[in-house]
Swiss-Prot record:
It catalyses: L-methionyl-[protein] + [thioredoxin]-disulfide + H2O = L-methionyl-(S)-S-oxide-[protein] + [thioredoxin]-dithiol; [thioredoxin]-disulfide + L-methionine + H2O = L-methionine (S)-S-oxide + [thioredoxin]-dithiol. Keywords: Oxidoreductase. The gene is msrA1. This is Peptide methionine sulfoxide reductase MsrA 1. Its EC number is 1.8.4.11. The lineage of its organism: Bacteria, Pseudomonadati, Pseudomonadota, Alphaproteobacteria, Caulobacterales. GO terms for biological process: cellular response to oxidative stress; protein modification process. Has an important function as a repair enzyme for proteins that have been inactivated by oxidation. Catalyzes the reversible oxidation-reduction of methionine sulfoxide in proteins to methionine. Disulfide bonds: none annotated. It comes from Caulobacter vibrioides (strain ATCC 19089 / CIP 103742 / CB 15) (Caulobacter crescentus). The active site is at residue 54.
Length: 217
């Protein structure tokens, strides 16, 4: 998941790649559970979009969470419409690698997913995650409602307290409204289920997120 053409600066609308009008081809069903990757999803389910570095490992973390109906690797928070992986890796689309998480809030809450998010990557690294460097590896939460926005901001503040108490850095995670989500190519979907020994760059700070624990810091 390393790009030969890395950039740490976000493109402008003028410098971003043009992309294309039609979506790129991808899988129709989830390789692990057989659910429809693109929906329609059962009534009552909600969606979350998270960015934690290379989406291969991130997706595996979330498809294992009880209450998660389906996951998908994709691109979001950028400019270029319907980008390819190669285009995203140039840094000229503005997108970050993300995972779409479709979940049943009666089984797993958004707050619980946030705890999983914070504890499974290092949100202080800016335009990188571990050895993966570039704007497409930045940390992000792309929210679909005011309630998600409030919960994301509250969790960020709580986790920052926990990190600061351990002498760790400042969170660089961006929290923004979810714009278009573009499904990644077929071979990226559920990659580590298809390739169990494949690359996984995911790793946390070792600091527990205090959400739902009844503790501060």
């Amino acid at each position: 998941m390393l790009s030969l053409h890395k950039t740490l600066e976000m493109p402008s609308a003028d410098t971003a790649l043009p992309g294309r009008a039609a979506p790129i081809p991808t899988a129709q069903t989830h390789f692990v559970n057989g659910h429809a990757l693109k929906g329609p999803y059962p009534e009552g389910l909600e969606t979350a979009i998270v960015a934690m570095g290379c989406f291969w490992g991130v997706e595996r973390v979330f498809w294992k969470v009880p209450g998660v109906y389906v996951t998908a690797a994709g691109y979001a928070a950028g400019i270029t419409p319907n980008p390819t992986y190669e285009e995203v890796c140039t840094g000229r689309t503005g997108h970050t690698e993300v995972v779409l998480v479709v979940f049943d809030p009666k089984v797993v809450t958004y707050e619980a997913l946030l705890k999983t998010f914070w504890e499974n990557h290092d949100p202080t690294q800016g335009m990188r995650q571990g050895n993966d460097i570039g704007t497409q590896y930045r940390s992000g939460l792309y929210v679909t409602s005011d309630a998600q926005a409030a919960a994301a901001a509250e969790s960020k503040a709580a986790y920052q307290q926990a990190l600061s108490a351990r002498g760790l850095g400042t969170i660089t995670t961006e929290i923004a409204p979810a714009g278009p989500f573009y499904f990644a190519e077929d071979y990226h979907q559920q990659y580590l289920a298809k390739n169990p020994n494949g690359y996984c760059g995911i790793g946390g700070t070792g600091v527990v997120c205090p959400i739902g624990l009844g503790v501060e810091g």
